[in-house]
Swiss-Prot record:
Matching HAMAP family: Pantothen_kinase_3
Keyword Transferase: yes
Protein name: Type III pantothenate kinase
Species this chain originates from: Nocardioides sp. (strain ATCC BAA-499 / JS614)
GO terms under cellular component: cytoplasm
Superkingdom of origin organism: Bacteria
Positions annotated to bind K(+): 128
Record's cofactor remark: A monovalent cation. Ammonium or potassium.
One Pfam family hit: Pan_kinase
Subunit structure and binding partners: Homodimer.
Biological process, per Gene Ontology: coenzyme A biosynthetic process
NCBIfam families noted in UniProt: baf, PRK13318.1-3, PRK13321.1
């Protein structure tokens, strides 16, 4: 029986039916802080239909406290008989967090670290391309979360340009014909696609240098729904794992349920 995994991010919520490391079905919906527990229940029943009655359990991680509160309420009221794990401090992940304040680290980042080491080994660097933020997370060869970096996400950057630039408008995230653009739309696309690619390669290169290992000794994994936008422009990635967080949620569920 599959597990329902929910990765609740600032911009979007990714839902997936996961079994044995494979994603059988998936959905991506906007994260709306106005949604109540009842709203989320209606949404889940509409998306999953009869499949919701066949799930083995529910695993949840969230970066939005208000939404997580409603999910807890939903699980208690609408799915009281379904086993569930909400990833938070105190939940066993098996990942030592070597940070000044481990509780500050987003649960999705710890889950990605767990899945990365489980699937590919360490040391590893996970680059998660979200709409609000692009995160870089470093895992040691021993499976320890040793730190990372956070930069503005691609969608957030584009929206900020649109709000602040009077003559700029929102554009589709596509690879332009060349870096040297001939119109405003392609100039914005060039800055986003090639700019983010250069940023990613630069940060990854610096991280590998600080780890003190050879570039070929590090697994560099791209994940997140915006990864395909820049994937072909980055030479640093060894793996593209679009469902890394869902796989990590499955692993955490197995350790705690």
């Amino acid at each position: 029986m599959p597990l329902l995994c929910a990765d609740i991010g600032n911009s979007h919520t990714v839902l997936g039916l996961v079994s044995g490391g494979s994603v059988l079905a998936d959905w991506r919906v906007a994260t709306d802080e106005r949604n109540t527990a009842d709203d989320w229940s209606v949404l889940l029943r509409g998306l999953l239909g009869a499949a919701l009655e066949e799930i083995d359990g529910i695993a949840v991680c969230a970066t939005v406290p208000a939404v997580l509160h409603e999910w807890r309420e939903m699980l208690t009221r609408h799915f009281p008989a379904v086993r569930h794990v909400v990833v938070e401090p105190g939940v066993r992940t098996g990942v030592p967090v070597l940070m000044d304040n481990p509780r500050e680290v987003g649960t999705d980042r710890i889950i990605n670290a767990l899945a990365a080491v489980h699937e590919y080994g360490g040391p590893a660097i996970v680059v998660d391309f979200g709409g609000t933020a692009t995160t870089f997370d470093v895992v040691s060869a021993q499976g320890q979360y040793v730190g990372g970096s956070i930069s503005p996400g691609i969608e957030l950057s584009l929206e900020s340009l649109g709000r602040r630039g009077a003559q700029l408008r929102k554009v589709e995230l596509l690879r332009p014909r060349s870096v040297i653009a001939k119109n405003t739309v392609e100039a914005l696309q060039s800055g986003m696609v090639f700019g983010v690619a250069a940023q990613v390669e630069g940060i990854v290169d610096r991280m590998i240098g600080e780890l003190g290992v050879g570039a070929t000794d590090v697994q560099v994994i791209a994940t997140g729904y915006l990864a395909p936008v820049v994937l072909d422009e980055c030479r640093c990635f060894t793996h593209h794992a679009p469902w890394l967080t869902l796989r990590g949620l499955e692993l955490v569920f197995e350790r705690n349920a």
